[in-house]
Amino acid sequence: MMSFEEEQLRDHAVVNLYRIGAIRFGDFILSDGKKTPIYVDMRLVISCPDVLQTIASLIWRLRPSFNSSLLCGVPYTALTLATCISLKYNISMVLRRKELKHPNQEDKIKVEGLFSPGQTCLVINDVIASGRSILDTAKALEDEGLNIRESLVFLDRQVGGADALKEAGIKLRSVFTLEELVKALLSKCQLSETDAAIARTLLETF
């Protein structure tokens, strides 16, 4: 059962993400080409330390019971989240490079930081859609000998990402599903009439 403190953190996150414009309603196209009436832009939280820390706390509450000595944020939006979690909870972090540091050398560096093969690493992300970015990050980490068992995210858009991760042997844990987020927006935020109408229509699709 959710604690009162966690409920407060969730409410704070939703209200403030909408307030700063990180959650918007309208007509948007995702990176995979699919259309959506709601867009969540977590890049804006870097300018709002209190919101960033709230989201980091919510994500960290999802952590599994087994010991994980490392975490890695999916580049690039989740790097700030991962860094915040690392500093707040004193857990080591590694960095996956999307662009290789030495592309013309044999010793191409894919993962930066101090780690040893066999360690377990949690993959942190802000939003999951198809799951491709998490899977790409997991593969880079596994290529270096790290074990990837779970991924923690703020929002699951519920468009197949969790199933894609499951097929790869990775369990997904999310603070919100898209359905839960929309319900929270309707109950906790003072949405404009237009946004509220879009939110109610979106809920009917779940």
Curated annotation (Swiss-Prot):
It comes from the Bacteria. Orotate binds at R157. GO terms for molecular function: magnesium ion binding; orotate phosphoribosyltransferase activity; orotidine-5'-phosphate decarboxylase activity. NCBIfam families: PRK13809.1. Homodimer. Belongs to the purine/pyrimidine phosphoribosyltransferase family. PyrE subfamily. InterPro entries: OPRT (IPR023031), PRibTrfase_dom (IPR000836), PRTase-like (IPR029057). Its EC number is 2.4.2.10. CDD domains: PRTases_typeI. Its cofactor is Mg(2+). Catalyzes the transfer of a ribosyl phosphate group from 5-phosphoribose 1-diphosphate to orotate, leading to the formation of orotidine monophosphate (OMP). GO terms for biological process: 'de novo' UMP biosynthetic process; pyrimidine nucleobase biosynthetic process. 5-phospho-alpha-D-ribose 1-diphosphate binds at R97, K98, K101, N125, D126, V127, I128, A129, S130, G131, R132, S133. It is an enzyme of class 2 (transferase). This is Orotate phosphoribosyltransferase. It holds the Pfam family Pribosyltran. Pathway: Pyrimidine metabolism; UMP biosynthesis via de novo pathway; UMP from orotate: step 1/2. The keyword Glycosyltransferase applies. It catalyses: orotidine 5'-phosphate + diphosphate = orotate + 5-phospho-alpha-D-ribose 1-diphosphate. Keywords: Glycosyltransferase, Magnesium, Pyrimidine biosynthesis, Transferase.
